[in-house]
């Protein structure tokens, strides 16, 4: 899954600009642009701020292994 693509599609659906997303989430515009392009390495906290604005959440699961 490409989280940047998911965020970009959700942002477009909500009709908010990259600048609006940056402003509402309290992160820099370059962070939003980099994330949507699939570059950069945002922290979990930064991702959470952005996801909150677009109405998404992130869940972590323990990976099942085959023995």
Language-model regions, residue ranges each:
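Absolute protein N-terminus
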Residues: 1-3
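Residues within the alpha-helical elements of helix-turn-helix
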Residues: 13, 24, 53
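Short alpha-helical DNA-recognition segment
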Residues: 16-31
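DNA major-groove recognition helix of helix-turn-helix/homeodomain DNA-binding modules
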Residues: 45-60
């Amino acid at each position: 899954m490409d989280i940047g693509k998911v965020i970009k599609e959700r942002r477009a659906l909500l009709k908010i600009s990259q600048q609006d997303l940056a402003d509402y989430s309290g992160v820099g515009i370059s962070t939003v642009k980099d994330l949507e392009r699939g570059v950069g390495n945002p922290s979990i906290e930064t991702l959470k701020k952005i996801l909150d604005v677009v109405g998404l959440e992130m869940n972590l699961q323990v990976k099942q292994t085959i023995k």
